[in-house]
From Swiss-Prot:
Organism the protein comes from: Evasterias troschelii
Gene name linked to the record: WNT-6
Entry function: Ligand for members of the frizzled family of seven transmembrane receptors. Probable developmental protein. May be a signaling molecule which affects the development of discrete regions of tissues. Is likely to signal over only few cell diameters.
Subcellular location: Secreted, Extracellular space, Extracellular matrix
Lipidation (O-palmitoleoyl serine): S1
GO biological process, one term: canonical Wnt signaling pathway
GO MF term set: cytokine activity; frizzled binding
Disulfide bonds: C83-C98
Family as reported in the entry's similarity comment: Belongs to the Wnt family.
Keyword Metal-binding assigned: no
Protein name stated in the entry: Protein Wnt-6
InterPro entries linked: Wnt (IPR005817)
Post-translational modification comment from the UniProt entry: Palmitoleoylation is required for efficient binding to frizzled receptors. Depalmitoleoylation leads to Wnt signaling pathway inhibition.
Length: 117
């Protein structure tokens, strides 16, 4: 006589919100790096930062200052950008509008959700 055991394993994708939160945490903790002479090593520009692991988020160039007008673009730096007026974080209007003030606008739109009850 014999017995048979069936074992099934699977991994579930985290929610989109959880992925976004994890990515934001990594973004906030990211470090600027330069390439090592061996072509495979990443060296943090700040000597107080530990070398990154394969799972760390790093960058090699600073982002442009979006608060300064860009002569290559026709419009001013941040005009027409949506923001969150109540947030003091990265998506907040005070930060995105570079402290220059902003105009609040309420937009109401109707969407056909194709709901069934």
């Amino acid at each position: 006589s014999g017995s048979c055991t069936l074992e099934t394993c699977w991994e579930k994708m985290p929610s989109f919100r959880e992925v976004g939160s994890r990515l934001m945490e990594q973004y906030k903790g990211s470090a600027k790096v330069t390439g090592g002479n061996d072509g495979g090593t990443l060296i943090p520009e700040d000597s107080t930062v530990k070398p990154p692991s394969e799972l760390d988020l790093v960058y090699s160039m600073d982002s442009p200052d979006f608060c300064e007008p860009n002569p290559r673009t026709v419009h001013s730096a941040r005009r027409g950008v949506g923001c969150n007026s109540t947030s003091m974080d990265v998506g907040g209007c005070d930060i995105l509008c570079c402290g220059r003030g902003y105009v609040e606008e309420t937009v109401i739109f109707q969407v056909n959700c194709r709901c069934r009850f």
